[in-house]
């Protein structure tokens, strides 16, 4: 399995969440890059974030973000 651009955008967005504070969410503004808006919508549709424009991680989203950030640290 390779990481296509859409998946890469979703992984990049998951890596933006601050895992040390569950009260830190993110907000994707309407004038953000279309790829970022699309990634947020897809993560929301998959049940990983609470709002289509960001919000907070769900329980599943937190697990995904933890794995994403761990993988990023390993590969750096």
What is each stretch, according to the model?
Residues 44-55:
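A short, conserved structural fragment
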Residues 1-38, 70, 74-76:
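Short amphipathic alpha-helical interface segments
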Residues 53-76:
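Accessory beta->alpha helical hairpin/"wing" motif in late/C-terminal subdomains of nucleic-acid enzymes
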């Amino acid at each position: 399995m390779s990481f296509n651009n859409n998946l890469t955008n979703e992984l990049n967005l998951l890596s933006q969440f601050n895992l040390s504070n569950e009260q830190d969410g993110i907000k994707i503004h309407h004038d953000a890059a279309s790829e970022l808006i699309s990634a947020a919508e897809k993560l929301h549709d998959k049940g990983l974030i609470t709002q289509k424009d960001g919000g907070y991680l769900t329980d599943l989203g937190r697990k995904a973000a933890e794995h994403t950030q761990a993988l990023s640290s390993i590969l750096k």
